[in-house]
């Protein structure tokens, strides 16, 4: 489920979802954002620490922060100007 915080960051809680769902939903959410927008993703899947940074790179976005608290990882992502391989 996603929400928008007071600073305009889209909050996406993917807790409890297993691979590949956190990566797929992160990609979908990033593609729906306007360039320069921020996305905060919370995930508990151990593979999210590998998969989500790869999605961020593939989408031409920037991983601004990664916080871990036990099994919970929180990713702060800024969408780039455009996806590197976007088709017109």
What do the PLM-derived regions correspond to, one by one?
Residues 7-15:
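Short amphipathic
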């Amino acid at each position: 489920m996603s929400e928008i915080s007071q600073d305009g960051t889209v909050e996406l809680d993917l807790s409890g979802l297993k691979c590949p769902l956190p990566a797929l939903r992160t990609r979908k959410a990033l593609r729906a954002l306007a360039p320069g927008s921020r996305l905060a993703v919370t995930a508990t899947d151990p593979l999210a620490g590998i998969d989500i940074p790869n999605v961020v790179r593939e989408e031409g976005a920037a991983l601004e922060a990664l916080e871990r608290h036990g099994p919970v990882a929180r990713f702060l992502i800024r969408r780039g100007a455009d996806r590197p391989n976007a088709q017109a």
